[in-house]
Curated annotation (Swiss-Prot):
Protein's cellular compartments: Cell inner membrane
Top-level taxon in the UniProt lineage: Bacteria
Identification of the protein by name: NADH-quinone oxidoreductase subunit A 1
InterPro entries referenced in this protein's UniProt entry, alphabetically: NAD(P)H_OxRDtase_bac/plastid, NADH_UbQ/plastoQ_OxRdtase_su3, NDAH_ubi_oxred_su3_sf
Gene expressing this chain: nuoA1
Organism: Pseudomonas aeruginosa (strain ATCC 15692 / DSM 22644 / CIP 104116 / JCM 14847 / LMG 12228 / 1C / PRS 101 / PAO1)
Coiled-coil features, chain-numbered ranges: none
Chemical reaction(s) catalysed: a quinone + NADH + 5 H(+)(in) = a quinol + NAD(+) + 4 H(+)(out)
EC identifiers of the protein: 7.1.1.-
Length: 132
């Protein structure tokens, strides 16, 4: 039964077993060799050798999350355009038209976001409606 497996399958199983064993070994050694001090000082926050002051709960602006979402949305286009550029000769004009439509759709989305003010950092311009 086991002889029917290809050598690559055995290599994959050995790799997975080795990775699992290494993870368990590191977790086990950390548990055995690690310190177990409990107390009031253990639960205090520590920042680069300086005692912290104030609250650690800072409020961040939603603008950073907006920029992160826009980066993810418009950053996804790069792998598609790279793959298109690599296979340009094989795809011909059909691939060129598809890539042009893809980039055009992304540009329409970018212009829409600019029009509604999603790319502006000032709150008064962002409240503008798209039909104004």
């Amino acid at each position: 039964m086991y002889a029917s497996f290809a050598p690559a399958t055995w290599a994959l199983l050995a790799y997975l077993f080795g990775a699992l064993a290494l993870c368990l070994l590191m977790l086990g050694l950390g548990r055995v060799l690690g310190g177990r001090s409990h107390g009031r000082a253990k639960n205090l926050p520590f920042e680069s050798g300086v005692d912290s002051t104030g609250s650690s709960r800072l409020r961040f602006s939603v603008k950073y999350a907006l920029v992160a979402m826009l980066f993810v949305i418009f950053g996804i286009e790069m792998p598609f355009l790279y793959l298109w550029a690599v296979s340009l000769r094989e795809n011909g004009w059909a691939g060129f038209v598809e890539a042009t439509l893809f980039v055009s759709l992304l540009l329409v989305g970018l212009f829409y976001l600019h029009r509604v003010g999603a790319l502006d950092w000032s709150p008064e311009r962002r409240r503008k409606k798209p039909h104004d």
